[in-house]
A protein has these predicted regions:
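Long, highly charged low-complexity segments enriched in Glu/Asp and Lys/Arg with interspersed Ser/Thr
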Residues: 153-155
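Extended two-metal-dependent nuclease catalytic cores across DNA- and RNA-processing enzymes
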Residues: 1-143
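Charged, low-complexity intrinsically disordered segments
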Residues: 145-151
């Protein structure tokens, strides 16, 4: 939440560039102009310029993909029966997770469509959990953050 707040308010804090150092791909939700994530595990950096080397969706579509497929590491359930390929197809057809939610019930007899129609209420809940930027100030209390510049004395 603190990283999301700094990304959201980078102009306010006069931050030219933000490197997020983490192996957690959730932080890729924060990648934008002048914000990248470096994985200390893979030794690779994710930027807007090389985004397509890492993902089959746009940065804007990434949150929708995560809303539909979930995130086991963060205990965010996806829609049963919907993996990345099916999620990508739905995103391409409807635009984003919220538009999919708005179109429920979806027509079709496939099991994953039936599952989506039965579990669609999970979409806005997942969106709120995954949307780091929108909800970061509520989570940390924006008034509790300050940026200290200069050399810090270790003593």
């Amino acid at each position: 939440d603190i990283a999301a707040h700094l990304v959201k308010e980078k102009e306010k804090y006069d931050l030219e560039y933000i490197w997020l150092i983490s192996s957690d791909k959730d932080w890729d939700l924060l990648v934008q102009n002048n914000v990248s994530r470096f994985s200390y595990v893979t030794r690779k950096e994710v930027t807007l310029e090389n985004w397509n080397d890492h993902y089959d969706v746009t940065p804007e579509e990434y949150i929708s993909l995560k809303c539909l497929t979930g995130d086991k590491g963060d205990n965010v359930p996806g829609i049963p029966g919907i993996g990345p390929k099916r999620a990508l197809g739905l995103i391409k057809e409807y635009g984003d997770a919220i538009s999919i939610y708005d179109h429920v019930p979806l027509p079709g007899k496939y099991k994953y469509i039936e599952s989506l129609n039965e579990n669609y209420e999970q979409i806005p809940q997942n969106y709120e959990l995954m949307d780091l930027i929108t909800y970061c100030d509520d989570a940390i209390g924006a008034d509790n953050i300050s940026v200290i510049r200069g050399i810090m004395d270790a003593a």
